[in-house]
Amino acid sequence: DLLSGVRSPRGFMLVCLRGEEAQFETDRRHMGLTELTMAEAKNLVPILNTDDVMRAALSTTAQDIDTDMMLQRFVGLLRTNGGQVETNQTVQAITKISEGWQVDTNQGQFTARKVINAAGAWGDEIAKLAGIPEIGLTPMRRSVARLAAPGGLDVQSWPMLFGPGERWFAKADASA
């Protein structure tokens, strides 16, 4: 199976600080999350400060994805089937032709029966070049802080944590 071993259980916990109750409730309902007592939440994530965290809700179905492993498997499958990966190029135009697609880059021109848009958050920009309707992707700048677990705690089994509106998140990093 192509995705065997790529996913692992994680779960996620939505946590609410004072003043975020309305957005928390909207998110909790929208995601169908089970609300926890503060004791239950603290049992799962012992460092939660229950003086600041007012409410918490949990999903046990969320999973981590080993994105590097997944990508390497997809690249292997692509190459096994005669495909190629082209990197470090700027796509300038994508044109539908009778044999499939023509892609013009700053490094040259390529033709293929199929083209995979792997631009992630910038996928709408590539879609636009191909005359394909945008779906509303918004690239966002993120900041990362890698911190040692407090007090030597084992955080690997903790759910991912995030706040209402998904303005921030925290999760154990397997490579830390």
Regions found by a protein language model. Name each.
Residues 21-22, 71, 122-124:
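Glycine-rich nucleotide phosphate-binding loop and flanking beta-alpha elements
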Residues 24, 96, 126-128:
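Short glycine-/acidic-enriched loop or helix-start segments at secondary-structure transitions
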Residues 38-39, 68, 120-121:
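Alpha-helix N-cap/helix-start capping motif
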Residues 3-8, 114, 119-176:
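Active-site substrate-recognition segment that forms the wall
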Residues 59-114, 118:
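Helical element adjacent to the flavin cofactor pocket in flavoenzyme catalytic cores
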Residues 1-47, 53-55, 167-169:
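Dinucleotide-binding Rossmann-like beta1-alpha1 core, especially the glycine-rich loop
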Residues 47-53, 95-102, 152:
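A short, glycine/Asx- and small/polar-enriched loop/turn
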Residues 14-16, 104, 146-148:
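Short, well-ordered beta-strand micro-motif
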